[in-house]
Each structure stands twice: as structure tokens, then as C-alpha cells.
Amino acid sequence: MAVLLALFAFVQPSPAGRLTAVISGKITDGQGFPLAGAYLYLASPAQLGIRNFITSESGRYGFPDVTPGSYKITIELPGFKTVKVEGVVLSPGGTALINFKMERTEIEEEAVRLESGQGLDRTTGRLAAVIDRDLLTHIPMPRDFSSLLGLVPGAVFDNNVPSVSVSFHGAPVTSNAFVEDDVNVTDQVNRTPMPRIDVDLVDQVVVETAGLPVDRGPQQGAFINVIRRSGANDFDGSLAFYYTGAGLSKSLWSPQEIGSNNPAAPRVDRSNLDLAFTAGGPLAVDLGWFFSNVRFTSRSQSTPFESWRDPTNVFHSPYNWKDTDFAGMFKVSVKPMRNLLGRVEVNLSNIHEPVYQPDVAWNRPLESTRDLTGQTFFLAKVGALYTMDQGTFVDASAGYVHQTQPLPLNPGGASKPSYFDTGTGRIWGSGPYNDQEGRKGFQSNVTITHLQDKLLGVSHELVAGGDFETGKATSSVWKADDLFMNYFNGSPYTFGLAVSPHSASLVGLGRIGFSNIPGSSLAPMLTTRDIKRLGAFVEDTLNFGNRATLSLGLRFDHADTTLKPVSKGAVGNETALSVGETVVKPAAGFNPFGGAAFGQRDNVINWNSLSPRFGLNFDLFGTGKTFLRGSYSLLPEDPALAYTKNLDPVSADRIHNFYWYDENGDGKVDVNDTYVAFPENYNAYFTSLYNKRIDPYLRAPKVNEWTVGLDHELMPDFSLCVRYISRSENGVIGDVMFDPATNTPWYTVQGSPAGRWVPFTTTVPASIAYPATEVTVYFPSTGAPAAFDRIQKVPELDRKYRGLEFSFRKRMSHNWQLFGSIVWSRSTGTAGLASPLAMGLASPVLTPNSFVNISSGSRTDMDRPLSIRVMGTVRFKWDIFLSAYYRFTSGAAWARSVTITPPADWALENGADPAPVTVFLESPGSRRHSSTQSTDLRLEKDFKRNGRTRWTAYIDVLNLFGDKSEIVDYNDGSWFPDGPGGSTGTHVLSGTYGQAVFLSGTRTVAFSLKLRF
């Protein structure tokens, strides 16, 4: 009788971000001697055709590049009983190591043994969450990809709201890579996916959060691998309908509760319609498949904005948000010959939002929003897999992506200035600017994998490959009026009354700014940024006696960014042009608000990096049930294009600030008023100084990451995993004050020449919630060099993450499934709340105030000490399914902050610039917002005919128990001390002090019906 000696899975690093797996092992007789000439067949509904292998004298076999799915393995050899193993489940990027022992026989018979595949990816290095089709089918959640990411252990959403801006195990939200069917769809500027990922197209999602294999590019975050559905030998189609809306979705906050807070009501669905059609099947049985999808969604929500009259006496009414999305995909897989598999797919989408979703806020009226007028996305991919021999294959692919994103201003405010009240937090007038964004990307990769037996006494999986990628980001920006005007509690005079340096009269003193955005669409600000990457990698995964595997990998990357020539017309505000001529030009030598052109800048960021990556997997007891795992990686940062945006010679986001003395007292900014420039970086416009904007010796920062853990198969299909994750990074990139004349930074007191910074100590008075607090802030001296900033590594910026992850997975069998995790973690460092640039975004320049009450022990903005996620499904009689999904997350860390404006006479006497500064009054993490939790439920029923499901109906109840949370504004507002060392002065709290500025809590009931044919 044939005996299956061992079945256990080592999920090992995979080449080229491949979407496939490997099956390998050894065939022996009853005495353990290898068997040559054994014939293996590998079959699955997920695979085109049947693959085969003939063993050599070593008895070893291997099937590289196997499509994920459930497989049947058959082994035949004359004189031996035939062996069949069914239900071997393979996850993307995995290697299943399966050894067989065959028994001799004199008659033809079969020994059949059913075995389940692994319950959890057992990897030599990577820590990965696999969200398979069973989870995708039954999880109760909104039909969007961001909600799906919330199931991944260690995930923390930016602002605690499900989105694609997400951190995994302490990594920056901008450090993830989003990949669809081997095509990188990550926006090179903001580092989020360019398309909306359609959950109807998803077959599996693999999120690798630590221990990344060498084929994963230069990144420090998660590798989010979305595997789309493919066709099959049997035709299958579906028509799905999903709806929720008014009466089915409601706020859990009463009008009285909302009325007592700031207008921050949670958004509620007015209507949410989702229609999807899919069809897939054979072009020719075992030779070619196709899969197609068309999807239309229409969604409308209320917004938290309530009726309001702005300080210029304009009334603003409530408004709703609406979105429509049309998308389509077509995919073909062909196998024209036994050893060649080809793939082609195209994908397109079009999105329209009359109100751009990121602009929706309680403090922003309709006139201050933008219109997403038809965002288009296109993806095309070709790929081929060529099997050279039984143990060697070559995988090559190429992909192209293109996105356009037009964002015109709302017509109601397009010609107005932009207004912001620093006291109340209110916004009105024009939105940011009219913008036409574009993205293009091309990528190609090739990988060679070879399974080698008995090399130096052990078996090897040898991987070598390379990848090439180009990215382009374009922007065309203009705005009729470039004035940015600050109010304070309804008054245009931010600093009250002051003596004008021109007229010597007591007049209103305000803070205003002008951007350098052109005033006409005929001469917009045109910027183009390019990036090129070239990578190469090698890896050897050694198998020691089927008991341990060791992977040794090394990756090299070269990245180069370029700024194409930039041009712009003059701004549209006449006062800005006048101020530029009379105030800025005499000091700086030019008018930043006039027309300008700048030449191309090559090699803006040009760095090479080496990334060693190692992994270990050891079968503790030799049973294939318990594995000790560990990994070590040195992960370089991906430069992307975010840094180059911060280095643009002209930037749509750059605003030059001025003290505004309202000479005629009309409350309006005009040419007859007096203006004094803030000390800002006008040197950035000079080509001769441009190269000093970035450290010429800048190299890619690297994260030191190591993990250690244990996997245990508790029972068939049920696995447990414990993993400890350590990540640390020192010398994070920041933007610092820099003196180009002496080539020295001066962003800290200790590292600056004497007299550069003037200290000012004051005591911020007690408020309703907090005691009085003493703080020392720093103002630049009037004798300091002209403002200039440089991007460089900052020794004072660091981040550290320590986490313990416990996860469990019960695959869908015996009518139930379970997936969950508990993560205890601590995320600390100065690179977080202290330095947004360290998160890959444009940031304020670092000064000594950036480190007030900030230390390496401060909690970062992504710190969540405890997060719990559990999702399960039970199948009852009559094909009724009940699924529940629970999640809990600790509240975000925060700390009190205050904006301090020193007395004018003190500033004059001490030679200090009195521009306001904002600092923390305590270390971040001293306080936390409230934790959040929610429970979702789904009840569904399959209706079958002739043994096949024809209809599926379900109802979702999201936030079943009505959980809700709030964020209350208890910041200390603005402090105008009478002098140094005391606690007297004017303390102005924000207009929302003690009120909720964010409310979370809705309950939604949704219905869905799916017809299959």
C-alpha cells in the first residue's frame, strides 16, 4: 500500500513578485531509497492543462511556477502502487515541499489519500497575510479595497479611517507597493494605488508585511499583491447587484449630540449602488482561457458641512458628495505549446466626482472644493512563462499604466482668494488650485528559477533576475487669484493692531500669502518629473534534509530622478505682482510672482543601494507541523518622486507669507497697503544654489528589520502563527535650515553658530482640561543667514517599531472558517509627528522647535499598542452562511500643541524674528484619542439548481452594535505672552475647543443579489 510519508509546506521567497508557487519534493521506496522514473501528474481547475515530471536517480521532482489553487498530484511507477494526493492548497509565492514513499505491488491498484494544503503560509522569511477567495466571498464589509486591507494584521489606517493610506507594522504609509497581476500600480508621488482596486476582480490578496524576498523592490513597507481572477475550462458568469442608501444607513449620533459639537456629523450613504458583470471560460479547453468584468458604481453621501455664514458675509449651504465609477477588464491566458504559457490583459476605468472626496470636511464649503472631472486609468500587461526543462523556467513580463486626473476648482469660488481662519479652523473662498495631473509608468522584469539537486550536498532553489521601471508625473496648474488670507476668529487682522512701519499709524496687522501659481490656463505652471529604476537580484534557498531551509539573497538597485524644464506665467493677483516688485525684488533680485522658466535638472536624486535578505525555516520536530522561522533584511528606501516635488524650483504648494498692514482699514488686501516679507527661502529660485537644495552625498536610508517566530498546524486546515517584528531606522531624511555660503546646517541650537537662535521661555496658562505648562521655543535671529533649506539625512530623526503578532487561520472546510490576529506593538521615534517629510511627504523645514518635547521615546502618529481582528464564517443547513467580522484598535497618540507669538518689543530688543511658531507642550503619546471597535455581520443564502449555485443573496449589517467614537479638540490654541518668563498674556483657544471635530459612528444595512450562469 502506498504511504504518504510527509506533507508539509515551506512557503519560500518567490521570484519577480511572481503570482505563482512551486511544488517540489522527493520520491522513495519503502526503505527510503530514491526512485528514478516515477511519473508525476499535476492537475487543478486553476491550471491550464496537466503538467508532468519524471524523476531522476535522486528521486527528486519539482513543478515551478504553479498557479495558486487546490491541486491533485498523481504518482505512477511500474511495480509500485499509484499514489494520489488531493486538496494541496498553494498560496502565491509559496513552495510546497511534499515527500512520498511508494510501496511495491504485483497488481495494479491505487492508494488514494486525501490531504489538505497548508493552513498558513510557512515562509523562510516573509510574514504574509493571504486573503483567499473564501474570505473575499464571505467577509461582511463595504465593497472597497481599503476595507479589505483592514483585515491584515498590523494594519493602521491614517486618521483611523479605512483608506489605501495605511501603515503595516510601523512602516510609513508612503512606503507600500501596490501590485495588480505583477504590474506596479503605485502612484510615484503620493504612494497610493492609482486605480480603485475592484474587489470583484480579486482572486487572492497577499500582503507581505515583513521579511520581503529579494525580488520585492527597494521599499520599506508592505508588498500588496493583488491577484486577479482568471478563466477556467468551464464557462462561468455572474451578474451582481449591491445596494444600500437612505433609510438603510444612518448616523448613530443624535441631532442634540451633533448640535452640541462642531459640525462634524459622520458621513451617511444616501445611495450606494454597485452593479458588476463577469464572464470567464475556455477559448479552447486546456489551451486558452479568458476572463472579463464590467462594473458600474454610483454612490452619494451626506457631508459633515452644515449651514454657515463666512466672515465676508457669504452664506454657505450644506452639500452632498457623489461618485460614479465605470471600469472594465479583459484577460486572456493561452498555452500554445507544452512549455510556454502566455498572458495578456487590459484594464480601464473612469471616475467622476463633482466634489473631490479628499476635499470633503466639516470646515470646507462647496465653493472651496474641487471637481474630479473624469479620472481615467489604463493598464496593459503581457507576460510569458517558458519552461526550459523540468527544473528551470524563465518568467518575463511587461506592463504599462497611464492615469489622468483633472481637478478644476469649483466655479463658485474659482475666482476668489483662499481664506483660512486660524482660530476657528474654517476654510472658504477658492480651493487650492486648478490642476491637471498625469501619471505614466512602464515596467519589465525577467526571472530565471532553477531547482538544483545535490549541489554541495543539499538541494537548492536558485533565483536570478532583474527589473526595469520608469515613471513620469506631470502637473499643469493655474489659479485666477493666488492670494491666501489668514483670519483669526473672524477678523482679517491675525495679529490685531500694530504701528505701520510706513505710515506710523495704528492699523490692522494680518498675515497673508501669495503663491506663485499662474493666473491663466493659457500659461500654466507645467512640471514633469521622471524616475528610472534598475534592479538585479540573486537568491539561493537551500534545503537541508527536508528539515530546514535557508534563503540567502542580495538585491541591488539604482534609482535616478529628473526634473524636466519648468515654465509658468505671471500670477493673476495685481497686488501680488506689485508686492513682488516693490518688496521681494529689491532684496532677492527677482519677482517670484512674475513669469519664469527653469531648465532641466538631471540626477536630482541618484543613489545605489544593496539590500541583503536572509530567511530561516526549521521543522522543530520533523513532523511538518511546527516550524521555527526567522528573517533579517536591510531595506533601502524607494526615492519615488515625492522628494523631487519638494525640490521644484517653483511649486504650486509654495506660499510666500507677508505681514500685511491695512493702511486704509478696509479689511482688503490691495496695492496701497504695506507689506513686510517673512524670512523665507527665496534662494531656492536661483539656479546657482539649486544643487545645494539636496545633499550631494545623500544615500538611501535603510531599515534594519529582523523577525523570529513559530508556526504550528493545530489540526488540518488550522494553523497558528506567532511572530516578533523589530524595525529600526536612524538618520531619516528631513528638510533642514541650511547656510549655502558656509555649507553648514543650522536646524538645532547645539549644531548652529552662536546667536542664530534666540530662546524664549514662557508659561502657557492652564485651560479647562490642562494645567499651566512652561515651554522654551526658539526664534531665528535677525542676523541669521537668509532662509534656505536642504534635504539631507538628519541624525536626530529616527523611528523604531517593536511588535508581537499572533495570528490564526482556519481554511474553509467542514463548514467553517476563521481568520484573525492580535498585535501588541510600540512605535516610537522623532520621525513621525516631528517630521512629515520623513513620511515621504513635503514638510515644514526642521528647526529647533521641531524637537521641543520630542525624543526617541515619543510615540509616532502610527502607534497603536493593541489591535484585534477576527473574521469567521459558519455554514448551516440549506446552504445558509453566517459571517462576522470584529475589529478593535487603540486610539492614536497625540499631544497638546500651541502656537506662540512673542511680544514685538521683545523681538526688537533681542534681535529675533517674531513670526509665530508651533510646538508640542508634551511628548507625543502622552495622550490618546479614544479606541475604536466595530462588529459587522453577514447572512447569506445560496440557491442551487442541479447541484450548482444559481443565486446568492445576502444582507450585511455594518457596525451591528452601534459603536461610535469622537475626537475632541483640546489643543491649546494660540498664546500671546506679555514677555519672557511669565504666564501673563492673551491665551486664545480655538473656536472648536472642547468640541468634537470628528465623529465616527454609522450603522449600515446593505443587500446584495448575485445571479450565476
Task: Describe each PLM feature range.
Residues 10-124, 198:
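Periplasm-facing N-terminal accessory domains of Gram-negative outer-membrane beta-barrel systems
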Residues 717, 730-731, 735, 826, ...:
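C-terminal beta-signal and adjacent terminal beta-strands/loops
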Residues 267-353, 372-395, 555, 612:
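Transmembrane beta-barrel wall of Gram-negative outer-membrane proteins
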Residues 721-894:
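Gram-negative outer-membrane beta-barrel transporters
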Residues 80-106, 110-230, 258-268, 272-281, ...:
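Periplasmic N-terminal accessory/gating domains of Gram-negative outer-membrane beta-barrel systems
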Residues 315-319, 459-621, 833-838, 845:
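Signature of Gram-negative outer-membrane beta-barrel scaffolds
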Residues 158, 565-611, 615-793, 847, ...:
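Solvent-exposed loop/turn elements at secondary-structure boundaries
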